[in-house]
Amino acid sequence: MNDSNKLFEQISNEFTQKGQLFEIREYTDSFGLKNKEFATFSDSLRKYFDFAAMHGDKDFLVFEDERYSFADAFKISAKVGNALVDAGIQKGDRVSICMQNNPEFIFAYMGIVGIGAVCVPLNSWWVADEITYALEHCDAKLMFGDQRRLKGLDDLKITK
């Protein structure tokens, strides 16, 4: 092991030891498999959102020349959630997202899970036929997509 690897391992061990912010603990999942997780992190998105809400005007997201505070992110996500409810989306319904990584993806995700719906992320590298196939099989009631991903889906009508 070279010196830089030793240094990385030493720093990692210091950050992940008991009592540190990135403390790692082992747990056994429902299949009996042992896994590792951060001990001090929230165990639900709701708790994470509650924690994040305490940071109001601090930067939540910086994307190219755009800046969003935590307050901005929650305000936009709430609008997304309200629009979903107005569109008839209910708790447990599936809503897909197919777009490049950008702020809108994050706000759509937060809005979806914020109302208790299930987010079905689709691969943004897919072409129209692949997106269509996924939508026909995931039971999404609605899809968020950017212009590039929506191209070729104009005539898409999925009914079950």
Locate each region found by the language model.
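Short, charged, surface-exposed hinge/linker loops at domain edges
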Residues: 12-37
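Structural core segment of the AMP-binding/adenylate-forming
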Residues: 1-20, 86-87, 114-160
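Flexible acidic/glycine-rich loop/turn elements at helix↔coil and beta-strand↔loop transitions
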Residues: 50-56
